[in-house]
Amino acid sequence: MANFKHKDIIALQDLTKQEIELLLSTAESMREINNRDIKKVPTLRGKTIVNLFYESSTRTRTSFELAAKRLSADTVNISPSTSSATKGETLADTALNLLAMKPDIIVMRHSVSGSHYFLSKKLPCSIVNAGDGVHEHPSQGLLDMLTMKDRFGRLDGLKVAIVGDISHSRVARSNIQGLTKLGSQVFLAGPPTMMPPGVERLGNVTVCDSLREAIQDADVVMMLRIQQERQGKTLMPNAREYARYFGLNPENLKLAKPDAMVMHPGPINRGVEMASSVVDGDQSWILKQVENGVAVRMSMLYHVCEGELE
């Protein structure tokens, strides 16, 4: 398997098209391991992976932990509520204390955008980004692309509509970076107060005035969660108004292609971003996204650790 040139995986912006394709290809191989009766290989035996989550997480933290264990790595989970961060310890000091434990990889989620680059300069071990502020969420972007590839067999030429709170979405940024590098056309829609200025500069991106315009003839419709916790003040009148103009329901979904897939990074606000009938409908690939998360994160850990795949 080809070598991966990076010590860290912090942003899809930092990776080439070929490197993203390599991570996706390896993830496809990792799925074979996940389908075995005994879901474990000795690839990262003897390696130590620290999961350092400064923000709450269920799917991402559990998925990274499961990925590490299936590759036979030792894992340590640290959360702010049980760490010295609650006593005022800085990220730099936390990093130096962790370094004394000699980890091979630190998987971190942090509320500050760019914090992983700071950590990478401080530490010789690999840093894997599990989400930083509103910057990027590379593992989510990769698993989303893998899920699209499962459905269509390709990414090149797909029309992907991303709808919702673009300004505060690290998921949107990672998807934009990855999808445009691999040849997809990305169409964005959301309330004007939730659309970052200059987003078109990120790649082959078109900003639309409405959900209906964005999802017209789309192959993929990706809905994003409204992130009130990242907003200094409310940026929408109320949930009912948001659902009226930017919520996905069975009627407006008909504007997309008949075989379009529906995605959401979770957690979902049913009845706001999407009607429950769409979440649970035949076009929903949301649970497949969760399933693909383990394989993608196995691929990321494997490549930064240069493991031997068996």
UniProtKB/Swiss-Prot annotation:
GO terms for molecular function: amino acid binding; aspartate carbamoyltransferase activity. L-aspartate binds at residues 87, 170, 225. GO terms for biological process: 'de novo' pyrimidine nucleobase biosynthetic process; 'de novo' UMP biosynthetic process; amino acid metabolic process. Pfam families: OTCace, OTCace_N. Pathway: Pyrimidine metabolism; UMP biosynthesis via de novo pathway; (S)-dihydroorotate from bicarbonate: step 2/3. Carbamoyl phosphate binds at residues 59-60, 109, 137, 140, 266-267. Keywords: Pyrimidine biosynthesis, Transferase. Its EC number is 2.1.3.2. It catalyses: carbamoyl phosphate + L-aspartate = N-carbamoyl-L-aspartate + phosphate + H(+). InterPro entries: Asp/Orn_carbamoyltranf_P-bd (IPR006132), Asp/Orn_carbamoylTrfase (IPR006130), Asp/Orn_carbamoylTrfase_sf (IPR036901), Asp_carbamoyltransf (IPR002082), Asp_carbamoyltransf_Asp/Orn-bd (IPR006131). GO terms for cellular component: cytosol. PROSITE patterns: CARBAMOYLTRANSFERASE. Catalyzes the condensation of carbamoyl phosphate and aspartate to form carbamoyl aspartate and inorganic phosphate, the committed step in the de novo pyrimidine nucleotide biosynthesis pathway. Heterododecamer (2C3:3R2) of six catalytic PyrB chains organized as two trimers (C3), and six regulatory PyrI chains organized as three dimers (R2). Belongs to the aspartate/ornithine carbamoyltransferase superfamily. ATCase family. NCBIfam families: asp_carb_tr, PRK00856.1. This is Aspartate carbamoyltransferase catalytic subunit. The gene is pyrB.
